[in-house]
Amino acid sequence: MVRRRPATGAAPRPHLAAVGRGLLLASVLAAAASSLPVAESSCPRDNSLVRDISRMQQRNYGREGFSHITVTGALAHGTKEVEVWLQTFGPGQRTPIHRHSCEEVFIVLKGKGTLLLGSSSLKYPGQPQEVPVFQNTTFSIPVNDPHQVWNSNEHEDLQVLVIISRPPVKIFIYDDWSMPHTAAKLKFPYFWDEDCLPAPKDEL
């Protein structure tokens, strides 16, 4: 009796259309952002083991009712994996609608507000989810999901501690929730990194 060997041909690969469009788009966006060049910092680094936050530079970058402190960061302190910000939003203030290819975690230190979270699985963010946030809560932003943090409280400040991965941050900004992901505008270096990181030169 002759035994036949089973066929050894490779199993058929699933068609590309079977791959989730959202996953494909997210991977393309992440690859595009991660391929951007990063220049060396031109700022002196503070390598102190202990630093007094009350003595750190606090700026609003032209946004009334907003303040930002880089508590520890890639350009000013030489961190490689994470960066930490302390941000305060006055009543009614909000971030731009934006996305980035890094992980981001918020800890609400005081006040209350609203997280608006869009989708990266469509061609544009779409109608955002509105999620209430308040003191002693924490929330995380999925990589490349468009979002906005808004102090929707009319009577008190919203203060948050923000932790991001893969600094310095590369941010894509949307005009509104219906703007296609491919039309979002890159802002790099971001405002608080401009003093330490010059904008990339146009090589053309």
Swiss-Prot record:
GO function term, MF aspect, one: zinc ion binding
Short motif Prevents secretion from ER, span: 201-204
CDD domains the UniProt entry points to: cupin_ABP1
Residues carrying sugar: 136
Statement: the UniProt record of this protein carries the keyword Calcium: no
One GO BP annotation of this record: auxin-activated signaling pathway
Signal peptide feature range: 1-41
Recorded GO CC terms: endoplasmic reticulum lumen
Keywords, comma-separated and alphabetical: Auxin signaling pathway, Disulfide bond, Endoplasmic reticulum, Glycoprotein, Metal-binding, Receptor, Signal, Zinc
Disulfide bonds: 43-196
Key word Transmembrane helix present: no
Pfam family, one: Auxin_BP
Binding residues for Zn(2+): 98, 100, 104, 147
Subunit structure: Homodimer.
Job of this protein: This is probably a receptor for the plant hormone auxin.
Protein name according to UniProt: Auxin-binding protein 4
Gene that this sequence comes from: ABP4
